[in-house]
Amino acid sequence: MAGPEEAVHRGCDNHPPFVGGKSVLLFGQSQYTADEYQAIQKALRQRLGPEYISSRMAGGGQKVCYIEGHRVINLANEMFGYNGWAHSITQQNVDFVDLNNGKFYVGVCAFVKVQLKDGSYHEDVGYGVSEGLRSKALSLEKARKEAVTDGLKRALRSFGNALGNCILDKDYLRSLNKLPRQLPLDVDLTKTKREDFEPSVEQARYNSCRQNEALGLPKPQEVTSPCRSSPPHDSNIKLQGAKDISSSCSLAATLESDATHQRKLRKLRQKQLQQQFREQMETRRQSHAPAEEVAAKHAAVLPAPPKHSTPVTAASELLQEKVVFPDNLEENLEMWDLTPDLEDIIKPLCRAEPAQTSATRTFNNQDSVPHIHCHQKPQEKPGPGHLQTCNTNQHVLGSREDSEPHRKSQDLKKRKLDPS
């Protein structure tokens, strides 16, 4: 049964579902009648004959009795019916997988549960071993199957002697060896299945359908919902039995289709997002490529900045030093072969000249030495020390210019007195 239907039935206070106004019991909820119970109990008390028991040699030379798996399944079908019992594997563990000289050794344990149609069950553990195979997959397959078969036989053994519990009685096994074995029955080849079509089953199914059509569907009966008790003021709200089963089936189908549809939508959405991301990355690459090309072309067109052997700042500092400390002052004096006297320098400084004459001479001095003030930096403001140095240089130059005519007259007088 599907999961949604089981959840619906569990939520309805464990009431069985209704089909055509009749309750339908699930597996594990059916009850044996008294006759069935007595017949099954009598059959399970019987002990198995030597025809059902096999033996093999175990480790250490000991003889071990067991029942083959297919015989146990046939016995369970005879006792409970083919649809009266079921088994399930609740847990399976791989204990070890060893590789030795190219051969695999595997051990697996499995827990198997056998349940009858009335809900009673037995559960036991089985173990399977595979040794010496060179294929790992085949070793695991053999060990798993052996573990499940062993667990199934041990679980069925708990129901009674007829399903294998009698082989644990060693006294019975000793006495069993005294019984002669019956000759196996000849196989009737006429009863073997040779065709795909089974006429007896088809005829029984057809008769069942015709019987249902002859009886007709029962009239829909108005019943209250089994999921909740109807209050007094809602007593007129009733549900139809036929609609219950159809709604449950439609609910299960809808849930399954919705889950499948959601998975498809998720996959489609993921593909769309991936495609959108790829397109965005491609557009970014295309947009970055032209920008880089334009930048490269622009860099190629622009001229390279001029490379000066002497930095501008160094040149300006050199000019400033030349302005503050003029080197051509002594060269001009040496060209005239004149040596300045201390008295000639001090005398003009001691004379008191009018302001107009000093201003005129200062202007002439500035004209004779034009490079002193023209090469100064306009941005730099000279400090007080710089102004004092410039004023001192101007006074020295002015006194020398004033003393030059006086020296010339003295030289002429000396030449006249000394004819040689």
From Swiss-Prot:
The keyword Phosphoprotein applies. It is found in: Nucleus. Residues 153-157 bind DNA. Residues 357-420 are annotated as: Disordered. InterPro entries: DNA_recomb/repair_Rad52, Rad52_fam, Rad52_Rad59_Rad22, Rad52_Rad59_Rad22_sf. GO terms for biological process: cellular response to oxidative stress; DNA damage response; DNA double-strand break processing involved in repair via single-strand annealing; DNA recombinase assembly; DNA recombination; double-strand break repair via homologous recombination; regulation of nucleotide-excision repair. Residues 222-291 are annotated as: Mediates interaction with RPA2. Residues 357-368 have a biased composition (Polar residues). Transmembrane segments: none annotated. The full-length protein forms heptameric rings. Interacts with ABL1. Interacts with RPA2; the interaction is direct and associates RAD52 with the RPA complex. Interacts with RAD51AP1. This is DNA repair protein RAD52 homolog.
